[in-house]
A protein has these predicted regions:
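Conserved short alpha-helical segments that host acidic/polar catalytic motifs at enzyme active sites
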Residues: 1-224
Length: 224
């Protein structure tokens, strides 16, 4: 309501034990400005965004958050208008001039309000094709058919890779055609996710395992 009704006022971070930092500038300058080296956390997400279809302003910087959900997103959502109109029916307003905002609201609506788990949400926003569903076991196929019919307006189309942060974990997801790259790596009890492997190796050069998830395949990592 603040974002929608009070001109010039925005809430960018409102979670418990979670913080969101937004800015326009070079990553090293942003980190120094917010003194990020003084913070500790079990999960960190970040995105250096170069806006191509929307205004470049600090409100459009990632992550986007609502309560304890945060989203960073690389790509372009061609289904944005359909997704936005559906979410507006349930009181969500997109005010920050970028398509990523609606993804955050979709997760809040499906997980917190509809009580769906993250794997089910992944099968809604990156739904399998009908031809794939037809080849599945009857019980699973019936469930996915229901999701595709009930939440058809929440299918996200276009190239994307996203990372969801939430209390106790993170989830990474590609579009179902894998039109955007995404790489996952592990070393001991640490998991790294990035658009490119070189970004991971810049932080941890000697990772033990590296792989690229399939399109529409969620990677869910939670605290022990």
């Amino acid at each position: 309501r603040i974002n929608n009704d009070i001109e010039g006022a925005y809430v960018f971070s409102s979670g418990k034990n979670m913080g969101v930092f937004k800015a326009v500038g070079f990553p090293e300058d942003v980190g120094e400005f917010y003194r990020l080296d003084e913070y500790e956390g079990y999960a960190w997400t970040a995105h250096g965004r170069y806006p191509t279809n929307t205004p470049g302003w600090w409100g459009g910087a990632h992550p986007f958050s609502l309560l304890d959900y945060t989203i960073v997103h690389n790509g372009e959502i061609s289904s944005y208008d359909a997704n936005r109109r559906f979410m507006e029916m349930f009181g969500y307003k997109c005010t920050l001039l970028t398509d990523t905002e609606v993804i955050t609201y979709i997760f809040d609506y499906l997980n917190r309000k509809q009580k769906l788990d993250l794997e089910d949400i992944a099968s809604i926003i990156a739904a399998p094709f009908w031809s794939e569903i037809d080849r599945m076991e009857p019980e699973k196929a019936e469930k996915l058919k229901y999701f595709r019919n009930a939440f058809s307006s929440l299918l996200i189309t276009g190239p994307f890779s996203i990372i969801l942060g939430y209390t106790g974990g993170i989830m990474a997801l590609n579009d179902r055609l894998k039109l955007r790259s995404m790489v996952v790596a592990e070393k001991k009890d640490m998991v790294y996710i990035a658009s490119e492997e070189c970004a991971i190796r810049a932080i941890c050069p000697d990772v033990e395992k590296v792989w690229s998830p399939r399109g529409g395949e969620p990677v869910i990592v939670e605290l022990n």
